[in-house]
Amino acid sequence: MLTAAGVSAVDGNYRLRAGIWGEFLDSLVMHYGGSDSLKTGWVSNVLFEPAVGNDLFHRMAAAEPLLTVKHGTAFVDARREKGRWIVRTEHAGKTETVEARVLIDATEQGDVARALGVPYDIGMESREATDEDIAPETANGIVQDLTYVAILKDYGHDVRIARPEDYDPALFACCCANPLCTNPREPNRVWSKEMMMSYGRLPGGKIMINWPIEGNDYYTNM
């Protein structure tokens, strides 16, 4: 999420500099020249360019002698055998087998856990199950909106491309306050374009567009 997905703004834990997070944060500070250099937008105190974060994660991984990173690897299946995990993957067109005492599912959607029959829920749990006031009274299957984040660069001059044939400005008319916004879905949350652009401003003249107000959230369901 912090690199390839473009959401290079970290929520909270600014003062809990420990473990992998502490190592990554310290590396960002060294790269940009200080903690204040990461406070470029108002959504977070830790903002950075995705490419920089990607480079730092690769350096951290490369420094570990017992860690092997294989990009472009897909999970096939796993089984438990004589107290060990036997995991099959596909890499570079070939099937590979890994044996381990511990298996951690770090896939985005829990592919390994699902394949092994681990119970799971989809959607919002009920208030009775969580004892949280913010939860719905009854459970439902609604999942969090998908977001296609965009990283823009401020060139300091007009670099607009030719208007695409199917472009419909009405879809995003109310992402911020402007004359085209006449019927907003959330009248109390129509903020200025300056607020939208400064929300995820990154170092290096970049801007993260991760805007939930009639912006780039895409609602769908399972």
Provide a role label for each language-model segment.
Residues 1-77, 81, 121, 144-149:
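Conserved N-terminal/central alpha/beta ligand/cofactor-binding core
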Residues 2, 71-72, 91-102, 106-222:
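Flavin (FAD/FMN)-binding glycine-rich loop and adjacent Rossmann-like elements that form
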Residues 14-16, 77-84, 156-167:
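Generic structural signal for short, solvent-exposed loop/turn connectors between secondary structure elements
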Residues 42-43, 48-50, 85-86, 181-182, ...:
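Mixed-charge, polar/low-complexity N-terminal
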Residues 79-97:
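Conserved beta-strand-loop-beta-strand element in the redox core of flavoprotein oxidoreductases
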